[in-house]
From Swiss-Prot:
Function noted in UniProt: Catalyzes the phosphorolysis of diverse nucleosides, yielding D-ribose 1-phosphate and the respective free bases. Can use uridine, adenosine, guanosine, cytidine, thymidine, inosine and xanthosine as substrates. Also catalyzes the reverse reactions.
Principal EC category: transferase
Sorted UniProt keywords: Glycosyltransferase, Transferase
A GO-annotated cellular component: cytosol
Organism in which the protein naturally occurs: Salmonella paratyphi C (strain RKS4594)
Catalytic activity field: a purine D-ribonucleoside + phosphate = a purine nucleobase + alpha-D-ribose 1-phosphate; adenosine + phosphate = alpha-D-ribose 1-phosphate + adenine; cytidine + phosphate = cytosine + alpha-D-ribose 1-phosphate; guanosine + phosphate = alpha-D-ribose 1-phosphate + guanine
Family listed: Belongs to the nucleoside phosphorylase PpnP family.
Catalytic activity, EC: 2.4.2.1, 2.4.2.2
Protein's UniProt keywords contain Glycosyltransferase: yes
UniProt xrefs under PANTHER family: PYRIMIDINE/PURINE NUCLEOSIDE PHOSPHORYLASE (PTHR36540), PYRIMIDINE_PURINE NUCLEOSIDE PHOSPHORYLASE (PTHR36540:SF1)
Gene Ontology molecular function terms on file: guanosine phosphorylase activity; purine-nucleoside phosphorylase activity; thymidine phosphorylase activity; uridine phosphorylase activity
Name of the protein: Pyrimidine/purine nucleoside phosphorylase
Amino acid sequence: MLQSNEYFSGKVKSIGFTSSSTGRASVGVMAEGEYTFGTAEPEEMTVVSGALKVLLPGTVEWKVYTAGEVFNVPVHSEFHLQVAEPTSYLCRYL
């Protein structure tokens, strides 16, 4: 079953799903802006198109991830994003 989610007054939208190849995941799009997300479980984020500038927990330097690149976020943590152009992503819940 698909589950639609909307965050930050509609600037981030995602569709959650479960598949045999991906497991539990969501795919979505972020509009330009700055966002902070919290995690309830470990997450693997893959940039599909565009770019995300990311500040991961325990780091002090921002890093840019572009299409095809992956970063991981630990359970029970926050990560910060800066988005300069509409960017799509795949988030796998590990």
